[in-house]
Design a protein with these regions (language model features):
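Membrane-embedded alpha-helical bundles of multi-pass transporters/translocases
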Residues: 1-223
């Protein structure tokens, strides 16, 4: 995956730097801190979206934090772990047009609900199917679960853009940076909580030891 990033980043960055024109800079508008706090406490839709982003970030973060352990310890396929994780993200990228079409058809909030239910169903389906050495199940889970990976964060940010536009219509001020800074915070908090909670539960409740000998109960805790 490291070589993948080293090769693709320059190939993608150079055309952007050469052919995408710079936009004309606009003078910034300072927002008094009192007004900023009023925005934070008065906008209920924003809070609902932040809670949704925190929860979605937590769920996706747990899956991401445990994936390598699942591939190496439970499936005992360490040689597949890194390349499968690469396809996990690649599938999420390629599936995004389908989720966007669904969002246009049923609404962004409903599309996100479908994506979360889909990912939950894939996780539940893994429980009876997972077994050591089963390459088909590992790759099937990776591709199918990865197809929904990008939907929640993308749709949530699209909805936050709508909230930012509504705020501009009501107040006459442009402050998308404030909204998206909060969204970035909840996303990072969700991912951090996911890593801390999942690793702590694995150690205390299941006595899982990374890279060591684990009994079936400890391995089952990964799922």
């Amino acid at each position: 995956m490291g070589w993948f990033c080293l090769i693709l980043f320059p190939l993608l960055a150079i055309p952007t730097l050469l052919w995408v024109p710079d936009s004309h800079s606009k003078p910034g508008v300072a927002i008094p801190w009192r007004d900023a706090f009023k925005v934070l406490f008065a906008n209920r839709l924003m809070w609902r979206l932040l809670v949704a982003d925190l929860a979605a970030g937590f769920g996706i973060g747990v899956s991401g934090a445990l994936y390598i352990f699942i591939a190496t310890a439970y499936f005992e396929l360490p040689e597949h772990a890194s390349i499968a994780l690469l396809f996990y993200f690649l599938t999420g990228f390629l599936a995004m047009p389908l989720w966007l079409k669904l969002a246009y058809a049923v609404g962004k909030d409903n599309a996100m609900k479908v994506a979360l239910l889909y990912m939950t169903a894939i996780n539940l389906a893994l429980l009876p199917l997972a077994e050591s050495g089963n390459i088909v199940v590992l790759w099937g889970f990776t591709i199918l679960f990865g197809a929904g990976f990008g939907a929640p964060p993308t749709l949530i940010r699209s909805m936050m853009a709508d909230i930012s536009d509504e705020d501009e219509l009501k107040t006459g001020q442009q402050r998308p940076g404030l909204f998206f800074a909060l969204l970035t915070t909840t996303n990072k908090l969700g991912a951090a909580f996911a890593v801390g909670a999942s690793f702590t539960i694995l150690e205390l409740a299941f006595d899982f030891v990374p890279g060591g000998a684990n009994d079936p109960a400890a391995l089952q805790g990964l799922l």
